[in-house]
């Protein structure tokens, strides 16, 4: 015969588990990212690595928290943030006027150089040469925004990531891929038939995106100031990005 214990006996236990769960959430900073953009964020042996990933981890450490990540398509990052699925987003996200209407941003933590990756037999030397070329870039990036500002909208083919863009270049479907200098260097080193040159410097830096009016924005800016003052931010930039000018 089963004995039915009073429900009130279990209430403290349930309450305890509930408190632990809330405490755990309070100690975690959940970032959205897209692990398809080395050396900023990428997957290696099933683990996210890169410049942005280490910045997020150091920010969390300064704030006494643990950084965790949700890896997704770049185009899904800001919608995930808008719907409250994550606390913040770090994934080479350019601070633009349009984005600032919807989201808060941290202070910029990096200003990228824009580079043209091309086949060595058909080099690109400057921005003017792009007007005669078919151009690939990653959807929603600084490069797409910048190319449109140069009145090159009709020349652009967008891809989900730069790996797809490079494959299109190697196959001859496009003439040039415009991307960040750090990634241009990596792709050129991995593909002997390719090279790159720096064609411009972005005026809009990368920032960490947050929900509008989030109190976390001030905390993250404080952490970035700490990392800038103690030299850790510069160390990370040297470690992951090095010298990409060419």
What are these regions (language model features)?
Residues 33-35, 110-118, 181, 185-225, ...:
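Periplasmic-binding protein-like
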Residues 20, 53-62, 121-124, 128-134, ...:
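Extended ligand-binding regions for polar small-molecule ligands
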Residues 25, 142-160, 192-200, 224-246:
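Ligand-binding clefts/hinges and TM-proximal coupling segments of bilobed small-molecule sensing domains
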Residues 53, 69-79, 139-142, 157-167:
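Short helix-initiation/N-cap motifs at beta->coil->alpha
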Residues 65, 93-94, 107-155:
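A conserved helix-loop-strand patch within extracytoplasmic ligand-binding domains
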Residues 24-92:
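Extracytoplasmic small-molecule ligand-binding "clamshell" domains
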Residues 16-18:
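C-terminal motif of bacterial Sec signal peptides marking the signal peptidase cleavage site
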Residues 79, 91-101, 149, 170-202:
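A ligand-binding cleft/hinge motif common to bilobed small-molecule-binding domains
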